[in-house]
Amino acid sequence: MDIKINDFTLGNNSPFVLFGGINVLESLDSTLQTCAHYVEVTRKLGIPYIFKASFDKANRSSIHSYRGVGLEEGLKIFEKVKAEFGIPVITDVHEPHQCQPVAEVCDVIQLPAFLARQTDLVVAMAKTGNVVNIKKPQFLSPSQMKNIVEKFHEAGNGKLILCERGSSFGYDNLVVDMLGFGVMKQTCGNLPVIFDVTHSLQTRDAGSAASGGRRAQALDLALAGMATRLAGLFLESHPDPKLAKCDGPSALPLHLLEDFLIRIKALDDLIKSQPILTIE
């Protein structure tokens, strides 16, 4: 099943779409500068692009951690991004009352992994009529995503994207099961599946309030996932990851974006140039 977002198609057999940007809005200037680089690179490489950022990181481990600019200021920044670059925008919501105002500005709204089973939030998101990106919870198997999809269908919205972001592997670690991408496609009606490589790289030191990360392995993991014929890649970058206010250890240094995407696009083009081979 393909989904139309602005002037491009998101589907598992179509050229991949990049959901890229920054983890959390830090300021208007930094947002526009980062987005400008994404736009320049993706247009040069011919990659369909959706800008991603959070206005509020509502699930930080510490109450003292930076959360973002908030809903009102965040929507103003998203409006400026759309006006300046003419691109679609995706952001996440955490409470039902946020859904409608966000949907009026953003083209795709995202259901956070930790909240994916919250029925009131699911229904509120569905009622907006917007495309919804569902993050697969770390504690849920790929096949159980079907239950969340059915909630959205019952609430009247079938414009859904499924997003892998790693599964809990013991304490303080995540792994990505490459077989899970196919399972989600098969059990959820071949909805578009994308891969959040950034958050799949997270680790955590025992007792730490901040997430660690393995960005040195970002390309390896991204290539492995994209080899399974995916609709898109979810990627966060930062001009200086050491200064990022959230998830810097997992963020791709912004100056490496073009070289990174050249390799991703080459693999995606190769995979999708071949007919699908079904093995029963």
Swiss-Prot record:
GO molecular function, one term: 3-deoxy-8-phosphooctulonate synthase activity
Gene3D superfamilies tied to this protein: Aldolase class I (3.20.20.70)
Entry keyword annotation includes ATP-binding: no
This protein's GO CC annotations: cytoplasm
Compartments where found: Cytoplasm
Main location: cytoplasm
Pathway note: Carbohydrate biosynthesis; 3-deoxy-D-manno-octulosonate biosynthesis; 3-deoxy-D-manno-octulosonate from D-ribulose 5-phosphate: step 2/3; Bacterial outer membrane biogenesis; lipopolysaccharide biosynthesis
Family annotation (SUPFAM superfamilies): Aldolase
Enzyme superclass (EC): transferase
InterPro entries per the UniProt record, alphabetical: Aldolase_TIM (IPR013785), DAHP1/KDSA (IPR006218), KDO8P_synthase (IPR006269)
Catalytic activity: D-arabinose 5-phosphate + phosphoenolpyruvate + H2O = 3-deoxy-alpha-D-manno-2-octulosonate-8-phosphate + phosphate
UniProt-listed Enzyme Commission number(s): 2.5.1.55
Keyword terms: Cytoplasm, Lipopolysaccharide biosynthesis, Transferase
Transmembrane feature ranges: none
A Gene Ontology BP annotation from the UniProt entry: keto-3-deoxy-D-manno-octulosonic acid biosynthetic process
Family statement: Belongs to the KdsA family.
PANTHER family from the UniProt entry: PHOSPHO-2-DEHYDRO-3-DEOXYHEPTONATE ALDOLASE (PTHR21057)
Protein name: 2-dehydro-3-deoxyphosphooctonate aldolase
